[in-house]
Amino acid sequence: MDLRAGRFDGQMTDDAAQFSSSIEFDKRIFKSDIKCNRAHTTMLIEEGIIPKESGKKILKALDKLEKEGIGALNLDPSFEDIHMALEDYVTKEIGDEAGFMHTAKSRNDQVCTDIRLTLKEEIENTISNIKSFIKTIVEMAKENTHTLFIAYTHLQHAQPTTFAHHLMAYANELRRDCERLIDTYKRVDMNPLGSAALTTTGFPINRERTTELLGFSKVMDNSIDGVSSRDFAAEAIFDYAMLSTTLGKISDEIVIWSSYEFRMVECSNQYSSTSSIMPQKKNPDIAELSRGKSTIAYGELMTVLSMIKGIPHSYNRDLQEVTPHLWNAIDNTNDILRIVHGMLSTLTINKDRTEELAGANFATATELADVMVREKNLPFRTAHRIVGRVVSEAIDDNITTHDIDNDYVNRVSVEVMGKPINLGEDLVKQALNPLRNVKSRTVIGGCAPEAVNDAIEKMEIFLNE
């Protein structure tokens, strides 16, 4: 079948045909193209637009192709795209009657329909995989509500928390990634089929019927928009880029925590490698690669935004180049999601080390200041100055949190405000105890076991929706 025969004499040069062909990345939409042609042909038959017997032959050929798979197509670049390769197959099966299949349809609306159908499936799969990862995280959190952990700001000791509390931060980030995809899905789930080249068609087609057959939620309201819009693709890539960001942050923390200096976690051997020269090494290569690969979706997003920003309505061949970047962003991010899920779920927590760090380097200092406010009605800024001086002098005196007592705090408070604060030994020791710190954070979102358990319950409601 020669699409050029009516308008042109001769063929494209081989290099021009190869340059303009989308056959290779069109393989991704093969199944959707069959669905699209099947729905369109069914509608044409029902509306009496094409001969019923010809339509039945087309549908039979499409069913046969679906069973045989993409290997049955001639994927020569001279066909330009999967649509013409598919039409060539049907033509070889039933002859010229195959031409009825393209009645009231253009490749412009056909490819948009195929991309949307395929992207819907991709988003559904990713949402399912994110929820599976969140479920794993929630189960890990349930087991670690009392596992002391150190939280950082600026990668410096900040305050004690629990490993469960930190895990639930991951879960909530992933939930938002999931919700973004759910929201984007609404804008993908629209049917452009029937837009034809750009102004619809003079045939009395039934767009609501193809919408029903293809499982879309609505018909696109404007045919020019139907064939020219790729904002849904850019939006989806953004969602995958944000998901990559979450996964990259998790990977980054695994790299840091697994170092000898931190020794908070250990990666499974399944997700580690060694050195070709240093036999003692256990390197978090998979975490590092996940962190590095998490940037790929950013590049794909910028590429697609650049492609679609400066072209006029409606269809332009530039748009052909959007889809490989869309699929690459999706595939790469899904790979990272699968790897990080497995890596985190097999992580070993060094609980002795995390408990040690939770109480080290004056991480409980904030609670000491808070106790001064609660027990002595001291302005927080005054308490902040006293505790800051306590820490500074303790460092100068080469003592740790465990060595700070009521007398030490009184001496410093005299220096700061001219009188002892007299908290008492019990209050000072309780304030500086990391476990007591954690248990006092009972507000919504806090690190106390009951607060984390509440957060887990909320997350499980989301997972079951």
From Swiss-Prot:
GO BP annotation list: arginine biosynthetic process via ornithine; L-arginine biosynthetic process
SUPFAM superfamilies: L-aspartase-like
EC number: 4.3.2.1
UniProt keyword list: Amino-acid biosynthesis, Arginine biosynthesis, Cytoplasm, Lyase
Gene Ontology molecular-function annotations: argininosuccinate lyase activity
Gene from which the chain derives: argH
Reaction it catalyzes: 2-(N(omega)-L-arginino)succinate = fumarate + L-arginine
Protein name as annotated: Argininosuccinate lyase
GO cellular component: cytosol
Pathway(s) it belongs to: Amino-acid biosynthesis; L-arginine biosynthesis; L-arginine from L-ornithine and carbamoyl phosphate: step 3/3
Transmembrane parts of this sequence: none
The organism of origin for this protein: Methanosphaera stadtmanae (strain ATCC 43021 / DSM 3091 / JCM 11832 / MCB-3)
Protein location: Cytoplasm
Keyword Transferase tagged: no
